């Protein structure tokens, strides 16, 4: 399974850009393999992302904003979920990856 971070390269929102950069930077710094999927360039990927996000994670109005994180077809969460997992030191579990300890055994 591959981690996919759905981003919007042409977002006009500074907050969205900072959140995207925070996730990508963390994954790169921790050498976690991932793909960026730009939903502004790939209509089919944007629609796929929207369909796969659980109802309870959708906003009352409009569409979910990037960044959104998936492991293969499994939805992991959005920026808030990612941030919470960083704060509680559960990022590997959040991403549905074996922990560093598991891979060292």
UniProtKB/Swiss-Prot annotation:
Pfam families: SH3BGR. The keyword Protease does not apply. A motif (SH3-binding) lies at residues 61-67. One of its GO terms (molecular function) is SH3 domain binding. The keyword Ubl conjugation does not apply. Transmembrane segments: none annotated. Its main location: nucleus. Belongs to the SH3BGR family. This is SH3 domain-binding glutamic acid-rich-like protein 2. The lineage of its organism: Eukaryota, Metazoa, Chordata, Craniata, Vertebrata.
């Amino acid at each position: 399974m591959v981690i996919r971070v759905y981003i919007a390269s042409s977002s006009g929102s500074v907050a969205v850009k900072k959140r995207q950069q925070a996730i990508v930077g963390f994954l790169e710094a921790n050498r976690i393999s991932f793909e960026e999927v730009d939903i502004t360039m790939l209509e089919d990927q944007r629609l796929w992302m929207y369909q796969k996000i659980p109802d309870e994670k959708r906003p009352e109005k409009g569409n979910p904003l990037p960044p959104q994180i998936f492991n293969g077809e499994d939805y992991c969460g959005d920026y808030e979920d990612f941030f919470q997992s960083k704060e509680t030191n559960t990022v590997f579990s959040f991403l549905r990856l074996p922990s560093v300890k598991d891979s060292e055994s």
